[in-house]
C-alpha cells in the first residue's frame, strides 16, 4: 500500500465514517471536522508533503458538511419519534 492509497482512498473514507459516527455520539458538528483537520495536518507533515495541505482543507470541509447533515438527520428522526 503506497501513500496515494492512503491519501485518496483510506483517509477520506475514514474521515467520512468518523464524521458520521462522531456526530451521532457527541452531537457536536464542529468536533469531528476539527479532529479531521488535526489528523490531516499531522499526516501532511509526517507522511505526505506540503502539496497535501489543500486536500487536508477539503477533507475537513467534507467532514463539516457531513457532520451538519448527520445532525439534521438525527434531529429529524428524533422529532418524528423513530
Curated annotation (Swiss-Prot):
Keywords: Cell membrane, Membrane, Transmembrane, Transmembrane helix. The chain crosses the membrane at residues 4-26, 31-48, 52-74. It comes from the Bacteria. It holds the Pfam family DUF2651. Signal peptide: none annotated. Its main location: membrane. It is a multi-pass membrane protein. It is found in: Cell membrane. One of its GO terms (cellular component) is plasma membrane. This is Uncharacterized protein YbeF. It comes from Bacillus subtilis (strain 168).
Amino acid at each position: 500500500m503506497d501513500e496515494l492509497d492512503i491519501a485518496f482512498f483510506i483517509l477520506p473514507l475514514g474521515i467520512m465514517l468518523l464524521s458520521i459516527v462522531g456526530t451521532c455520539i457527541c452531537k457536536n458538528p464542529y468536533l469531528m471536522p476539527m479532529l479531521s483537520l488535526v489528523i490531516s495536518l499531522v499526516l501532511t507533515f509526517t507522511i505526505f508533503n506540503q502539496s497535501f495541505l489543500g486536500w487536508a482543507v477539503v477533507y475537513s470541509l467534507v467532514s463539516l458538511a457531513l457532520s451538519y447533515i448527520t445532525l439534521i438527520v438525527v434531529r429529524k428522526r428524533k422529532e418524528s419519534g423513530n
